[in-house]
């Protein structure tokens, strides 16, 4: 049997897998167990009572976290004219049309979010096989296809989380860094859950938010007592 690391022993000793933790207790424990040399991301996994195989039960959208996500987000925008200048002024790192598409086709992918104005989708549509598998294809449901590219850029820079229910009805997302104050992580999680509740499909029956689990990059998953959240 492989020897357990000091971190693994601490997790085994302090984590009760059968327990639901209040959000405050969960964050405190994750902070206590975080001893790596980088700022771990705090991730949330939410099990929804949906069947994502049914077209009327897809859950997809975006939430702007009130305290950001602690990441330096690089943005590419497909647009032209005055919109292009406005996107640059808002902080977008890459702005263009056909020339930007050519760079992406050539393998230049140094960005985290892609935004497009509606008139640019004729160009972006050619990149589906490149952007789609990476989860970067602009979509109106996530606010990344919009005539208001300035707001979209600002939201992306502010730490907007895009979510989409995967197989099994599970949503994954980062809600900040372990170095964040507990109240900031709590309010970020509450913002995400609030938007998920608004996105509940009408055909979804029974319990919608089945399980909420909080974890860090290298840490354990802790099931959250949803009554400890103000949503």
Swiss-Prot record:
* Example of a GO MF term: rRNA binding
Q: Report if keyword Ribonucleoprotein is assigned.
A: yes
Cite the entry's keywords alphabetically.
Repressor, Ribonucleoprotein, Ribosomal protein, RNA-binding, rRNA-binding, Translation regulation, tRNA-binding
Q: Which domain of life is it from?
A: Bacteria
Q: Name one GO cellular component term.
A: cytosolic large ribosomal subunit
Q: Name one GO biological process term.
A: translation
Q: Does the keyword tRNA-binding apply?
A: yes
Q: Describe the task this protein carries out.
A: Binds directly to 23S rRNA. The L1 stalk is quite mobile in the ribosome, and is involved in E site tRNA release.
Assembly, in brief, is: Part of the 50S ribosomal subunit.
| Family under the similarity heading | Belongs to the universal ribosomal protein uL1 family.
Query: What PANTHER family does this protein's entry cite?
Result: 54S RIBOSOMAL PROTEIN L1, MITOCHONDRIAL, LARGE RIBOSOMAL SUBUNIT PROTEIN UL1M
NCBIfam families assigned to the protein according to its UniProt record, in alphabetical order: rplA_bact (TIGR01169)
Q: What protein name does the entry list?
A: Large ribosomal subunit protein uL1
Q: Which gene encodes it?
A: rplA
